[in-house]
Amino acid sequence: MNPGILIVGSGFAARQLVKNLRRQDGEVPIRLIAADSCDEYNKPELSHVFSLNQTADALTRQSFGDFAEQFQLTVHPHTRITAIDTQQKMVRSGEQVWHYDKLVLAIGAAAMVPQVPGHELMLTLNSQQEFRDSQLTLLQAQRVLILGGGLIGCELAMDMCRAGKQVTLVDRSGSLLSGLMPVEASCRLQHALQQMGVELLLNQQLGALTQHDEGIQATLSNGRQLWVDAAIASVGLRPNVGLARQAGLQINRGIQVNNRLQTSQVDVYALGDCAEIEGQLLPFLQPIQFSAMTLAKNLLGAAEAVKLPAMLVKVKTPSLPLQLAGETRRQDLSWTIVAEPQGMIAKGFDQHQQLRAFIVSEDHMKLAFGLLKELNALT
């Protein structure tokens, strides 16, 4: 009997792949194995649980049993794969062994925690289980330190402030969202957060955390000390590559795959936050959706290359929502920025005056799809 397709992981990437496989083939055996509960939840909602006063359990959308029944697959929750044998085409968890015809690693990425003294006091919110583990502390905390002014850090800072907490956001760069956009565009969000009451400490790094009876003492690189009830690390994600390394797959920042999502080993693929697609890490929902559609076809016999158009990235900060697309990180773009009371439009042009990126906020977000169409016409 054909052992079929074996997927390691149960997050958004894995589920998108299962759904795409079943749209094309109702018979191929699918087995999904993951270390977590395998229940479905919407990960972006983790950035808004505090203002909505939600618990971790309230985020669950579908149990693993219902998912398995709906899409006709075998699911193994709370099962950690400890080894892969690509020669024998099998995976192992302790004494248990499963064979595969095609193997997909959709094992995600882990939140990075700066290795400063007291780093074990830092919390992360990269999964439903991580929120479940820390929700009592975070829901009760009044003074919160957020380390990292990127996408998730800004979303959490605004949400916690809306929930009535005293929030301090620390980032080593000189502006928010520095990995996504120029300072001229992000200053509007910076002003909005400060107006809400978020204390922004930019060009600063965390030096140490110390637990005391009255709370956690955070010491910054400039010597300043803060007293907080909780500290959250939001400085980025590191792809989970340990299992792939053990299996002899080529890894760089993530598990290296080509444009067909194939790893360096035959019949082994990677998808989602763990995958490095031709040198790029793309930990956003839309690239994963496109990749899952392509990979499903390839697992069923095709040899298609994933095509990733310019896609919208949404910054879910309700008091000042933003959308961006294109090569916003390019250093050689010339930006034109129009800031009005009803919103901002920022356009990045290359040396040939071709539109290569844009950022829109508030009421001007209605222009996003037209600008996106213009971007994709150039590719």
From Swiss-Prot:
It comes from the Bacteria. Pathway: Nitrogen metabolism; nitric oxide reduction. It is an enzyme of class 1 (oxidoreductase). Keywords: Cytoplasm, FAD, Flavoprotein, NAD, Oxidoreductase. GO terms for molecular function: oxidoreductase activity, acting on iron-sulfur proteins as donors, NAD or NADP as acceptor. SUPFAM superfamilies: FAD/NAD(P)-binding domain. Its EC number is 1.18.1.-. InterPro entries: FAD-bd_OxRdtase, FAD/NAD-bd_sf, FAD/NAD-binding_dom, NO_rdtase_NorW, Rbx-bd. GO terms for cellular component: cytoplasm. Its cofactor is FAD. This is Nitric oxide reductase FlRd-NAD(+) reductase.
